């Protein structure tokens, strides 16, 4: 990559915050770098919101020797890396674009206004148009990655069957709607839907708390019922709770 970048001779590199090689190569070439951050900006203050389970923490500790070896390899190649935090943590000297608002970003006042731009989410137009139903609309989705939870979907279906609500489930590609059993007349299940179109008319969104989904729901003013699946999603959930924009399901059977 470094040889390719030298041949390209860019004036600036803009890279996702998780594409750590972008920042390292910019430093190596002595050119400006801009970090593009699609999650919350991460520093020692906001880190506490990304709560790790004991199992995840143990896995992280077990991986530390390998991380240490990789850092030493980078240092030997002339890259300026002190420790793992240099790689994963935002700093006050890097120009950074964050795709959320300062109101939603935890501890936004601890990030340098000279280097951080909280520009808000970029919400695309809906591909289709939905009419607002007469009855309240409940939208349920666990996103596109960690969504293989047919038992959870069945619990939602059972809880909301024959209720005075219309229910739309987006179950992803890992679960077939046909495997969810018989649906009552007020419930429909799909592998995917136009989420923007649904959120424009939804009254409640049961979500996994992915950053994109939450940003879109907040944009359209839809209250959230949250069922986070990962530490990052747990951090988003915590922030939504702090702002009073949603409630959390503590257990799957709490639906």
Task: Describe the predicted segments one by one.
Residues 7, 12, 34, 47-100, ...:
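Nucleotide-activated sugar donor-binding and catalytic core shared by glycosyltransferases
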Residues 1-137, 143-165:
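Nucleotide-sugar-dependent glycosyltransferase catalytic domains
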Residues 120, 171, 191:
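Short loop/edge segments at beta-strand edges and connector loops
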Residues 39, 173, 230:
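Residues in the short beta-alpha loop(s) of Rossmann-like NAD(P)-binding domains
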Residues 144, 154-188:
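Catalytic donor nucleotide-activated moiety binding site of glycosyltransferases and closely related
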Residues 18-19, 173-174, 194, 210:
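A generic "binding-loop/recognition-motif" signal
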């Amino acid at each position: 990559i470094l040889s390719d970048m030298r041949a390209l001779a860019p004036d600036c590199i803009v890279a996702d915050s998780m594409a750590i090689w972008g920042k390292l190569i910019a430093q190596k070439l002595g050119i400006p770098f801009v970090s593009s951050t699609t999650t919350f900006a991460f520093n020692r203050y906001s880190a506490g919101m990304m709560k790790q389970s004991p199992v995840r923490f143990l896995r992280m500790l077990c991986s530390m020797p390998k991380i240490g070896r990789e850092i030493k390899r980078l240092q030997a190649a002339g890259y300026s890396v002190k420790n793992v935090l240099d790689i994963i943590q935002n700093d006050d000297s890097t120009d950074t674009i964050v795709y959320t608002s300062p109101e939603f970003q935890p501890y936004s006042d601890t990030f340098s206004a000279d280097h951080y731009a909280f520009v808000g989410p970029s919400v695309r137009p809906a591909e289709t148009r939905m009419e607002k139903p007469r009855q309240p609309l409940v939208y349920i989705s666990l996103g596109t990655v960690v969504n293989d939870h047919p038992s959870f979907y069945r619990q939602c279906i059972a809880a909301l069957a024959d209720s005075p609500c219309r229910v739309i489930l987006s179950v992803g590609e890992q679960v077939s709607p046909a495997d969810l059993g018989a649906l009552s007349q007020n419930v429909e299940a799909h592998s995917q839907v136009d989420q923007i179109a649904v959120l424009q008319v939804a009254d409640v969104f049961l979500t996994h708390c992915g950053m994109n989904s939450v940003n879109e729901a907040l944009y359209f003013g839809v209250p959230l019922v949250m069922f986070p699946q990962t530490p990052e999603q747990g951090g988003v959930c915590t922030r939504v709770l702090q702002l009073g924009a949603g409630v959390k399901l503590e257990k799957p059977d709490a639906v």
